[in-house]
């Protein structure tokens, strides 16, 4: 190695190390003619850099943008309107206020959260082909995308535990409203802390990109595996085991262990219908969020930005369909929910039976707790004597109303 000296009048000598060159190439580097191979290498590097930049800024066709916007828009409207309606009906209707419905409201709030804080931004990134909202927004969007499914799966596990003890061991353990609130709060607090590392793994390294998947480093891989086990596999296995025991108990209720027909079952049919509804709900949820967890385990390299964007958008649409399908499932399997909607929007012929049917007395309060209804009795079906109480007080006996108790034990389930 030799050293070349550069003289300057205003500065001290600067010693620059240079490599030995062959004797036939002793000319100055500024005047030396580069080889053709060097030009080819520089051109290839420039081409690869430009191709990477074009992958990061793709342009979708108008048809692709319209299709994605329509599908996401329909699901978004169903999710916002349906889950808001679930919260409103359970809040206003007395017939739907129960312990199980606390869990239902918690899931509806989680669906509203992902509908507002995550899904619109994913659609915006897909349609524009870049991320323009900064690194902090990228972290928050991905955080809520991990938070909501974890909260919901643990709330579904809480519902499963509630159904198990209500049907199999009704006298040994009961999930009261206070216990339900504590279980819901524990689900939110635990998962909020569990998905905190997402804030460190995600972020916008440059202004126009927000990573879709966790990094392929050993830290990212380790967290992905732990999140898949704790946030999906273990709760799913527990849910399956609990519902398996519940189904066995429903079909095998004899003291001697013999199998009986469902018509001889001591379990009320309303609770059997509730189990069916929650089984379908759990199945839809697990199938909807399974592709999301599998894609995170796969750790695809985001070299082709358009391809990874298409994959992630499809996965987001599948998982988001679970949020939009829950209110539809409630309205199909839940007669009380349908009646609650009628009471909420005053669509019933008996507009607000609780406010117009009774005076404020002790007996009226007891009647409200026992779900008293009102029936119209036609005048042709009654025989009233001349000296009856109606004639004494000059009351017309054309349309008199009779109150009767519908159910002495109001249901404590969602159905």
UniProtKB/Swiss-Prot annotation:
Disulfide links within the chain: 138-210
The keyword Glycoprotein is assigned to this record: yes
Cytoplasmic side: 91-102, 162-182, 243-277, 326-415
Lineage, highest ranks first: Eukaryota, Metazoa, Chordata, Craniata, Vertebrata
Molecular function per GO: G protein-coupled receptor activity
Record's keyword terms, sorted: Cell membrane, Disulfide bond, G-protein coupled receptor, Glycoprotein, Membrane, Receptor, Transducer, Transmembrane, Transmembrane helix
UniProt note on tissues of expression: Abundant expression in the brain.
Biological source species: Homo sapiens
Bilayer topology term: Multi-pass membrane protein
Protein name: Probable G-protein coupled receptor 19
Intracellular or extracellular location(s): Cell membrane
TM segment ranges: 70-90, 103-123, 144-161, 183-203, 222-242, 278-298, 310-325
Principal subcellular localisation of the protein: membrane
Glycosylation sites: 25, 52
Family of the protein in this entry: Belongs to the G-protein coupled receptor 1 family.
PANTHER family referenced in this protein's UniProt entry, alphabetically: LEUCOKININ RECEPTOR, LEUCOKININ RECEPTOR-RELATED
UniProt-listed InterPro entries: GPCR_Rhodpsn, GPCR_Rhodpsn_7TM, GPR19_7tmA
Role this protein plays: G-protein coupled receptor that plays a role in the regulation of circadian rhythms and energy metabolism. Participates in maintaining proper circadian gene expression in the suprachiasmatic nucleus (SCN), the locus of the master circadian clock in the brain. May function as a coordinator of aging-associated metabolic dysfunction, stress response, DNA integrity management, and eventual senescence. Upon binding to adropin, modulates mitochondrial energy metabolism via the p44/42-PDK4 signaling pathway, influencing pyruvate dehydrogenase activity.
PROSITE patterns for this protein: G_PROTEIN_RECEP_F1_2 (PS50262)
CDD domains: 7tmA_GPR19
GO CC aspect terms: cilium; neuron projection; plasma membrane
GO BP annotations listed: G protein-coupled receptor signaling pathway
Extracellular-side positions: 1-69, 124-143, 204-221, 299-309
């Amino acid at each position: 190695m030799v050293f070349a000296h550069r003289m300057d009048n205003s500065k001290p000598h600067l010693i620059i190390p240079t490599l030995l060159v062959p004797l036939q190439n002793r000319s100055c580097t500024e005047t030396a003619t580069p080889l053709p191979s060097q030009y080819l290498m520089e051109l290839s590097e420039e081409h690869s850099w430009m191709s990477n930049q074009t992958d990061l800024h793709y342009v979708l066709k108008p048809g692709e943008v319209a299709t994605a916007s329509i599908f996401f828009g329909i699901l978004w409207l169903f999710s916002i309107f349906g889950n808001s309606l679930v919260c409103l009906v359970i809040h206003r209707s007395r017939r739907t206020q129960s312990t199980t419905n606390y869990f239902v409201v918690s899931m509806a709030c989680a669906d509203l959260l992902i509908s507002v804080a995550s899904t619109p931004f994913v659609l915006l990134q897909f349609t524009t082909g870049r991320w323009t909202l900064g690194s902090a927004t990228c972290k928050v969007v991905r955080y809520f995308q991990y938070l909501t499914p974890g909260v919901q799966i643990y709330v579904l596990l809480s519902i499963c535990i509630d159904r198990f003890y209500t049907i199999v061991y009704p006298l040994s353990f009961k999930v009261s409203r206070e216990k339900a609130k504590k279980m819901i709060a524990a689900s939110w607090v635990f998962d909020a802390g569990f998905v905190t590392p997402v804030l460190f793994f995600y972020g916008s390294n440059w202004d126009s990109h927000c990573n879709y998947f966790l990094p392929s480093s050993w830290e990212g891989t380790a967290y992905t595996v732990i999140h898949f086990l704790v946030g999906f596999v273990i709760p799913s296995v527990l849910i399956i085991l609990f519902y398996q025991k519940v189904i066995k108990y429903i079909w095998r209720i004899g003291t001697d262990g013999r199998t009986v027909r469902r018509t001889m079952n001591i379990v009320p049919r309303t609770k059997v219908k509730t189990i069916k509804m929650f089984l379908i709900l759990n199945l839809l949820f697990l199938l909807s969020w399974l592709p999301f967890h599998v894609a995170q385990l796969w750790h695809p390299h985001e070299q082709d930005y358009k391809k990874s964007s298409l994959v992630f958008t499809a996965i987001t649409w599948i998982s988001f369909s679970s949020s939009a399908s829950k209110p539809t499932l409630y309205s199909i399997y839940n007669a009380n929910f349908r009646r609650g909607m009628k009471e909420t929007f005053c669509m019933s012929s008996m507009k607000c039976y609780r406010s117009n049917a009774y005076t404020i007395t002790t007996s009226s309060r007891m009647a409200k707790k026992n779900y008293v209804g009102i029936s119209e009795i036609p005048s042709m079906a009654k025989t009233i004597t001349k000296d009856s109480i109606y004639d004494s007080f000059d009351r017309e006996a054309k349309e008199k109303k009779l109150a009767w108790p519908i159910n002495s034990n109001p249901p404590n389930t969602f159905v």
